[in-house]
Amino acid sequence: MSYNLTDPYEIARFIKESKKSTPVKVYVNGDLSKALMDDIEWYGANGFYILIGESDLIAKIILDNKHLIKHFRLENDRRNSAIPMLDLLEVDARIEPGAIIRDKVTIGKNAVVMMGAVINIGAEIGDGTMVDMNAVIGARGKLGKNVHLGAGAVVAGVLEPPSKEPCTIGDNVLIGANSVILEGVRIGSGSVVAAGSVVAEDVPEGVVVAGSPAKIIKLVDDKTKGKTQLLDDLRK
């Protein structure tokens, strides 16, 4: 079944109809040499095993063989999850530990995603863009090339509340720490959003906005460019 993931209602339907998953990993001290483990991934022998699979299948193996198990420890990080994480091995970018990136996200060459950042389904990150620590990009949020999304900043998604138009951030935009870009807002290339701003309306190219709600306070000049320049070495 195909879904139009540019539409918030289609994204919601995709999530609703996706097979929910509760994967677990279990370390077992015991004799599982005769256990039926065809439907899971497992490693080990001689009294020690690692089991990986859906929680209901693992639970059945543990219960069926409890008389042969001395100890076990279970690890679990999600419950009835609808969307898997992005396969980072296919990404030509720097992704730091602790970033949470859902499947069906596009990340450009030499982009950087820092610790604690969260990027939801359908988001697009341009070449050379940095998503700083604890920043959030909602479903279908679009960031252009060489953008800096500051620590703790939020780019709203198209899901709750549903919005046909995603947030769109142009190229070479700097968004300061803890700023919020509301649903459907477009920010023109080369603009700067001051830290802590709440942007509720579209921003033209080449301006500086600040405040809540954010207002244009000046044009981007050489002094502003000097204060907001990006470092290429961080993207190598």
Swiss-Prot record:
Record field: catalytic activity: (S)-2,3,4,5-tetrahydrodipicolinate + acetyl-CoA + H2O = L-2-acetamido-6-oxoheptanedioate + CoA
One GO biological process term: lysine biosynthetic process via diaminopimelate
Domain of life of the source: Bacteria
One of the Pfam families matching this protein, by short name: DapH_N
Keywords: Acyltransferase, Amino-acid biosynthesis, Diaminopimelate biosynthesis, Lysine biosynthesis, Repeat, Transferase
Molecular function per GO: tetrahydrodipicolinate N-acetyltransferase activity
Keyword Amino-acid biosynthesis attached: yes
UniProt EC number: 2.3.1.89
Functional pathway: Amino-acid biosynthesis; L-lysine biosynthesis via DAP pathway; LL-2,6-diaminopimelate from (S)-tetrahydrodipicolinate (acetylase route): step 1/3
Task performed by this protein: Catalyzes the transfer of an acetyl group from acetyl-CoA to tetrahydrodipicolinate.
Family: Belongs to the transferase hexapeptide repeat family. DapH subfamily.
Protein name: 2,3,4,5-tetrahydropyridine-2,6-dicarboxylate N-acetyltransferase
